[in-house]
Structure formats: structure tokens, C-alpha cells
């Protein structure tokens, strides 16, 4: 029996994952425990959870593997500053301070943290290995996939040097083919526009994607003529005269601002049509790059299956176009496509490539629906609810009665916090830690955004749909279990717009019902789809079945169980606190149902939102 612990840390979204004889036992992001979004610190609590789930101590782990090679990253930093000198002196001093104090000695830092966690001496630790960043991404994409053979495309900000890489996977082997190197990066290009439009880098990219349909792509030629030299095969180079991220303390510079005619939007200031048009433009460019790269990969390798990982693989609009317009028969995307997923990839790399163990292809995949985090029993939940600090009022329902009860609550227009089973690994809530509602409700989108999530009104919500019924509602004929593919709502479900509505522009498009499922239909008639399967989440599936039986609608609104700036809830305590602080109507904790109106009145703490830094 072999246990391998994978670790991702010290950049953003630190995480731990445990693999036992090639099977992913547990995986979790540290932010879920510390309640600090995108927490980059050493994942002490994540590791402890993974070890506990496996029922072992750190001393019983056979190998520990870090998801990237820090010394190669340091080499890249030095070479970059030399290449751009004398630019970037302030940034160089800041970077060197961090590296010379800690990052350069990461092996020692890791061993010290692990020894402290395992209550042992560093010499008694299991072997500590280091994997390349893009190899970790590629392994996370291919090894859990349902394919024996596939092309693997990784696109992100930057690893050690690579920003885009192509691999082929067969059996237990991953073979690298080519890379695009820093500073030429599709992920950093998208992040530069995220920064310029006033959103937070490594956090707000999905907002830019959601904003794009409100705009017109009028800057596409400007981007392609000045910023991005895009070749017919999808490879590219950036014009670094417009960017600051290689050597500066910001993503873009004055020349970039001059190109677009105005300074960067201040965070939290009102959005204008310009930001919407810029968002639409960079989204079109990104899709163009991804489609060209996809076609090149297909022509080069001739494989019908494609696996994706890296932060760019979270651009579900581009993924949807690649699926519809690309040449691949099947596409599988790692649900934790960002750096957190590198913990899984690093561990699987050791099992399959370092130890040369055979790979068993699992259907529908080897990610267990991405439900790899903590779970809580009814006994644990009731102990919390009965506690003197809470004294919650609740009803208990058997499984036989629970789903029908919650379906009736949802059909009545109520918003429900849904806390069931193991927590999701990755950025998406998939029915384990979700806030759910009736998609037919015309006010549900605005209520959820403004009164529950406390976030920007323009942001769309995703549908969860019974897997076998996805084609009844959406222009999609294959599973999308991880909410990573966007497709259009079927035309027969769309509502005709009046001539006046047709003339609406930009943010004026908001709150116009566009289909029979208005709460999940974006302004361009698209939806970010999650198909729900009985094999991976039987309880959420049963709820959808009961809701369909009651309403003739096999779809629910699904958004992550948190408020803006807060990590997705992990524990019953997190869930109850979020429930009480927002305008959710009901909370379902496993078999317990809590009505907001029945809960003890508490003094309103208006400062609680300051706990979470806005994302």
C-alpha cells in the first residue's frame, strides 16, 4: 500500500491531496479552513484533513511531492530581470527580498513545516520530491480522465517557464511535445485585462468573462494589432512594451492605458460601457487563441480526446466553443484546473511516472465528482445546532421525506442553503456546498446577487440539471459535471424580445427575462451548465428529481455557498453563520431543515462583511 501526499502552496490557492495506490482519497484547499480566500500559506489544515481521511499519520506517507520546482522559477526571475534591465529595479528588490528570505530555501521551509506538522525530525520525513508546474497540471488533467489516450493542453499564467504546453497521454505515461515560455502568456494577458478593468488578478478573471456578453468586441483588432502577435497555429507573442508584469509591480503600464484611451478603472467604481466592450474583446481574442491551439493540437497528434488544465481551462465560454467548433470528439477538464489541482497532479505523477505503476481508467472519471473534501454526520451537525452558542431551531427529516420537503420549499420561491456530503475540490460548488433556487423565478438572479451573495448585479448564475435531461434544456449533448462548459439555452425555451428590449445596450440588458428559465439564462442566452449524476451525488440528484416531479422542471439555480470575498463554506458552523448573515430563507444541513424565521434573533453585526476582503 502506497500513500502519496501532494502539496501546492506559496503562490495562491494552496492545497493538499492524498493518493492511495493511485486512487484520490482526499483533496482540499487551505482557504476552506482558514477562511481566507485564495490562501497561499502552507496547507497545514488541508494536510491534516487528508491524513485523517486516509486514517494515517504523516510518518505512514511514502512520498511527499511539491507541485513545482522553485529553483527553476528563481532562474526564470533572474533571467527576466536581466533581459529587461534597467527596468524593474523596485520590483527586483521586492522579489529578491522574498526569495532570499524564504522561497529560495523552499525545500528546507517545507521540511520544517512538515516535521512540525508530523511531530518528527526532518530526517525522519518521507522522501520529498518536486514536480514541474506544467507536468503537475498535465497529470491532473490526464490521469483522472476517462481516456486511455489523449492530447493534453495546459494553459495558465506561468509555471517555472512554461505558460502553454502540449502533452500526449497514453496509459501511465505523459510525453511533453512543446511549450510557450514566459513572458508570452495567454493567462497573464487575460489577467492584465482583468487588472485594467478594475478587477482582482487571480480572482476576478471569471467576472471579466461574465461581463463580456454585455459589451461589443470593438477592440479585437486593436489587441491583435498592438498587443498580441497571433499565428495561424495559435502560438503567440505579446508586445511587452504594453505590460508591466514581467518586471513591475502592476500588470499594465501607461502605454497600455493610452492605447485604450483612459486609465485603469478604479476597483469598486461604477462599470461603464468601455469596460464591457473591453471584456467582450479580450474574451473573443482568448477564444480565438484557444480554438486555433486546439485545431493545431488535433492536427499534430491526431487524437480524438483532449484534456485541459491550467487557469485558462476555467474559461468555460472558451471551453464551450472548443467543444462545439473544435475537432475533438471528447473533452475532459480537470475541475480544479488552477494551482490547487497541481497537488493532485503532482501526487499522480509520482504514482504513475516516478513509480511506474499501471493506470486503471475509471468511468466517468477518477475524480469522484470532485467531492473530495470533508463531510459531517447528522450527529456532528446536531451537536453543533444544539450548542449553547447557537440554539438553532430545526426539523429532522428522513431521506424518504427530505427531498420532497426541500423541493416544495424551492418551488415556493425560497432560497436554500444546501449542505450535503463531501465538500467540493476546486472553485465551483457542485451541490455539496451550494445555494440553490428555482430557475423559473424572474427575480431569483437579482435577489441572489444583491441580498444573499452581496456581489455585482451583472454576474450570472449557473444551472444544475439532471444529466439525462441536459439536451431538453440546453444545446449540449454530453455531460458537464464540473460546470466548465457554457452552452446556449435551447431556442424553443427562449422568450421573444420586444422591439424596445432589442434596442437595449450594455447593462440595460440586465433583468430582461430571456427564457423560461430566466434565473440561469445570461444576456447572450448562454448558461454555465452542471449536469448532475446519481453515481456521484445521489442526494442532489434526488432533489432535482423531486423538484422535476413537482414543477416539471429538472433544473435548479446553483451558486456557491458563500458571500462575496468568502471561501465556500466547509463546516456546519460556516454554513449556519452565512445563512444567518444573509437573506437566505432556509438551510438544509444533511437531514436537518432550518427556517430563517424560526431562528433565535441575534443582534445585527454590520461589521461582519469586513471579515472578507472583496474579490
Swiss-Prot record:
Gene Ontology BP, a term: biosynthetic process
Alphabetized GO MF terms: transferase activity
Record has Metal-binding as a keyword: no
Gene3D superfamilies per UniProt: 3.30.420.40, Carbamoyltransferase, C-terminal domain
Entries under InterPro entries matching the protein: ATPase_NBD, Carbam_trans_C, Carbam_trans_C_sf, Carbtransf_dom, NodU/CmcH_Carbamoyltrnsfr
Keyword terms of this UniProt record: Transferase
PANTHER family for this protein: NODULATION PROTEIN U
Similarity remark: Belongs to the NodU/CmcH family.
Name assigned to this protein: Uncharacterized protein sll1178
Organism: Synechocystis sp. (strain ATCC 27184 / PCC 6803 / Kazusa)
Amino acid at each position: 500500500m502506497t500513500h502519496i501526499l501532494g502539496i501546492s502552496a506559496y503562490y495562491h490557492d494552496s492545497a493538499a491531496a492524498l493518493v492511495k495506490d493511485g486512487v484520490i482519497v482526499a483533496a482540499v484547499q487551505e482557504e476552506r479552513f482558514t477562511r481566507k480566500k485564495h490562501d497561499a500559506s502552507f496547507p497545514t489544515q488541508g494536510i491534516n484533513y487528508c491524513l485523517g481521511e486516509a486514517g494515517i499519520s504523516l510518518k505512514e506517507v511514502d512520498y511527499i511531492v511539491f507541485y513545482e520546482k522553485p529553483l527553476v522559477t528563481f532562474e526564470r526571475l533572474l533571467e527576466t530581470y536581466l533581459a529587461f534591465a534597467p527596468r524593474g529595479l523596485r520590483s527586483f528588490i521586492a522579489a529578491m527580498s522574498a526569495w532570499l528570505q524564504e522561497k529560495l530555501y523552499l525545500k528546507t521551509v517545507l521540511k520544517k513545516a512538515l516535521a512540525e506538522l508530523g511531530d518528527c525530525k526532518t530526517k525522519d520525513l518521507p522522501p520529498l520530491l518536486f514536480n514541474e508546474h506544467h507536468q503537475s497540471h498535465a497529470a491532473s488533467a490526464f490521469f483522472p480522465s476517462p481516456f486511455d489516450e489523449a492530447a493534453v493542453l495546459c494553459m495558465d499564467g506561468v509555471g517555472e517557464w512554461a505558460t502553454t504546453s502540449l502533452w500526449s497521454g497514453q496509459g501511465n505515461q505523459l510525453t511533453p511535445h512543446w511549450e510557450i515560455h514566459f513572458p508570452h502568456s495567454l493567462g497573464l494577458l487575460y489577467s492584465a485585462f482583468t487588472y485594467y478593468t478594475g478587477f482582482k488578478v487571480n480572482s476576478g478573471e471569471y467576472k471579466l468573462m461574465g461581463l463580456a456578453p454585455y459589451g461589443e468586441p470593438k477592440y479585437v483588432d486593436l489587441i491583435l494589432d498592438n498587443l498580441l502577435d497571433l499565428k495561424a497555429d495559435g502560438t503567440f507573442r505579446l508586445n511587452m512594451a504594453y505590460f508591466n508584469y514581467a518586471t513591475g509591480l502592476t500588470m499594465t503600464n501607461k502605454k497600455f492605458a493610452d492605447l485604450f484611451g483612459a486609465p485603469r478603472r478604479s476597483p469598486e467604481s461604477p462599470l461603464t460601457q468601455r469596460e464591457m466592450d473591453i471584456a467582450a474583446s479580450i474574451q473573443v481574442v482568448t477564444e480565438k487563441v484557444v480554438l486555433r491551439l486546439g485545431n493545431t493540437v488535433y492536427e499534430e497528434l491526431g487524437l480524438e480526446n483532449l484534456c485541459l488544465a491550467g487557469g485558462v481551462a476555467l474559461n468555460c465560454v472558451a471551453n464551450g466553443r472548443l467543444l462545439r467548433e473544435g475537432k475533438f470528439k471528447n473533452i475532459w477538464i480537470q475541475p480544479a484546473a488552477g494551482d490547487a489541482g497541481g497537488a493532485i497532479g503532482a501526487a499522480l505523477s509520482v504514482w504513475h511516472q516516478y513509480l511506474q505503476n499501471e493506470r486503471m481508467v475509471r468511468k466517468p472519471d477518477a475524480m469522484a465528482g470532485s467531492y473530495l473534501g470533508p463531510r459531517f454526520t447528522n450527529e456532528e451537525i446536531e451537536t453543533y445546532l444544539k450548542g449553547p452558542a447557537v440554539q438553532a431551531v430545526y426539523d429532522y427529516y428522513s431521506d424518504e421525506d427530505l427531498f420532497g420537503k426541500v423541493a416544495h420549499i424551492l418551488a415556493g420561491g425560497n432560497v436554500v442553503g444546501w449542505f450535503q456530503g463531501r465538500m467540493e475540490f476546486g472553485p465551483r460548488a457542485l451541490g455539496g456546498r451550494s445555494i440553490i433556487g428555482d430557475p423559473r423565478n424572474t427575480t431569483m438572479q437579482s435577489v441572489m446577487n444583491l441580498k444573499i451573495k452581496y456581489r455585482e448585479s451583472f454576474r450570472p448564475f449557473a444551472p444544475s440539471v439532471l444529466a439525462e435531461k441536459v439536451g431538453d434544456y440546453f444545446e449540449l449533448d454530453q455531460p458537464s459535471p464540473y460546470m466548465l462548459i457554457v452552452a446556449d439555452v435551447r431556442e424553443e425555451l427562449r422568450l421573444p424580445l420586444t422591439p424596445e428590449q432589442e434596442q437595449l445596450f450594455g447593462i440595460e440588458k440586465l433583468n430582461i427575462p430571456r427564457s423560461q428559465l430566466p434565473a440561469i439564462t445570461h444576456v447572450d442566452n448562454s448558461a454555465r451548465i452542471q449536469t448532475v449524476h446519481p453515481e456521484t451525488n445521489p442526494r442532489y440528484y434526488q432533489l432535482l428529481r423531486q423538484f422535476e416531479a413537482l414543477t416539471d422542471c429538472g433544473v435548479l439555480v446553483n451558486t456557491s455557498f458563500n458571500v462575496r470575498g468568502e471561501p465556500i463554506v466547509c463546516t456546519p458552523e460556516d454554513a449556519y453563520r452565512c445563512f444567518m448573515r444573509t437573506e437566505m430563507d432556509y438551510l438544509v444541513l444533511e437531514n436537518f431543515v432550518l427556517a430563517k424565521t424560526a431562528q433565535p434573533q441575534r443582534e445585527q453585526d454590520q461589521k461582519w462583511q469586513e471579515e472578507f476582503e472583496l474579490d
